[in-house]
From Swiss-Prot:
This is Fructose-1,6-bisphosphatase class 1 2. It is an enzyme of class 3 (hydrolase). Mg(2+) 1 binds at residues 98, 120, 122. Pathway: Carbohydrate biosynthesis; gluconeogenesis. Its EC number is 3.1.3.11. One of its GO terms (biological process) is fructose 1,6-bisphosphate metabolic process. The lineage of its organism: Bacteria, Pseudomonadati, Pseudomonadota, Betaproteobacteria, Burkholderiales. PANTHER family: FRUCTOSE-1,6-BISPHOSPHATASE-RELATED, SEDOHEPTULOSE-1,7-BISPHOSPHATASE, CHLOROPLASTIC. It comes from Paraburkholderia xenovorans (strain LB400).
Length: 378
């Protein structure tokens, strides 16, 4: 007897598997099965995290990942869960993870499929020791889609080994993206290109149930998230925007803003999807050689896909993130995403600054800021 609720499996069947074209139906059936695998990995991670310190997975793994960061035991364990859940059933050609330096090839004993999976198995792992909110992020591409000869142009050699270039495609080519947020409840937020939808894990029976259909981000907001400790390293357009927000009712925005920061991209983006806001991890001068802080393939791209599908915008400050062509597996970009009108404003400030047209503003830290200082001539 049906209870009228839509499970993740039913949603994927209704959305992907019932297409008039038999070829497309077959391809989408593979995508549905892959997303069910990802959901199974998320359930396992949720169960592991629920045990907390009792599970024996807290603390350092005594290893360093490809980014030079100390790995926690849970970073390693959650990465293994994703790999083991998704490698065996012939749906994937290869995987990329924040915790793995190079492309993970599907082992020879398993069949190879049509999709590529990029993921961050545990976003915000620095919050684990304080029992804070963490998450998982994932992105799905079709192997070789839009790249002509699969062996020559998608990073595959004649033996069928998938190389880095298979993944180095703009985020607009994603066929699915999502994240899990492990909070008081576990939620899976997903898009397959027909809007952004949220599913809540019903632990008693192990199903993800559709609870947030067709999420829409409000176009206007009075809330922003940024790590203010880096203010001295920000570019002037970001300092200008944040100062205007901090000035509140007495400033040019004539409105009071709230500032947030959780140190977990999943938690920040989830809040924006639920009630609006802007998330900023902008370019800065702290490490000049670094273009940004967040990884494009498995952080910025999937989150940007979800945000755009929900009516928001996502930019580097100067261009749409989903149009950026990756140059490396673990390449980074600045990220500014969220409510449409505020992201447009921040993008406009970057344009004005680059053209030398930015307006002066007063900052307690930086004093007056403008290219048009007294005595300045072009």
């Amino acid at each position: 007897m049906q209870d009228g609720r839509t499970t993740l499996s039913k949603f994927l069947i209704d959305t992907l598997d019932r297409q008039p074209c038999s070829t497309e139906t077959a391809r989408n059936a593979g995508l549905s099965a892959l997303l069910i695998d990802v959901a199974a990995a998320i359930k396992s991670i949720s169960a592991m995290l629920t045990k907390g310190a009792l599970g024996g997975n807290y603390g350092s793994a005594q290893s360093i990942n490809t980014h030079g960061e100390e790995q926690k035991k849970l970073d390693v364990a959650t990465n293994e869960i994703f790999v083991q859940q998704c490698e065996w059933d012939g749906l994937l050609a290869a995987m990329v993870s924040e915790e793995m330096e190079s492309v993970y090839a599907i082992p020879p004993g398993y069949p190879r499929g049509d999709y590529l999976l990029a993921f961050d198995p545990l976003d915000g792992s620095s919050n684990i020791d304080i029992n804070g909110v963490v998450g998982s992020i994932f992105s799905v591409l079709r192997n070789g889609e839009g790249n002509g000869n699969a062996n020559e142009k998608n990073g595959s050699d004649p033996r069928g080994t998938v190389g880095e270039s298979a993944f180095l495609r703009p985020g607009c080519e994603q066929v699915a993206a999502g994240y899990a947020v492990y909070g008081p409840s576990t939620m899976l937020v997903l898009s397959v290109g027909n809007g952004t939808h949220g599913f809540t894990l019903e632990r008693e029976i192990g199903n993800f149930v559709l609870t947030h259909s067709n999420i829409r981000i409000p176009e206007d907001t009075v809330e922003f998230a940024i790590n203010a400790s880096n203010e001295r390293f920000w570019e002037p357009p970001v300092r200008r925007y944040v100062q205007e927000c901090k000035d509140g009712r007495s400033g040019c925005r004539a409105s009071d803003f709230n500032m947030r920061w959780i140190a977990s991209m999943v938690a920040e983006v989830h809040r924006i999807l639920m009630r609006g806001g802007v998330f900023m991890y902008p370019r800065d001068s702290k490490t000049p050689a670094m273009e940004g802080r967040l990884r494009l393939l498995y952080e910025a791209n999937p989150m940007s896909f979800l945000v755009e599908q929900a009516g928001g915008l996502s930019i580097t400050g100067r261009e749409r993130i989903l149009d950026v062509v990756p140059r490396a597996l673990h390449g980074r970009v600045p990220v500014i995403l969220g409510s449409k009108h505020e992201v447009e404003r921040i993008g406009r400030y970057h344009g004005e600054y680059d053209r030398g047209e930015d307006q002066p503003f007063t900052s307690p830290l930086f004093s007056r800021r403008s290219l048009f200082l007294p005595g300045f001539t072009a």
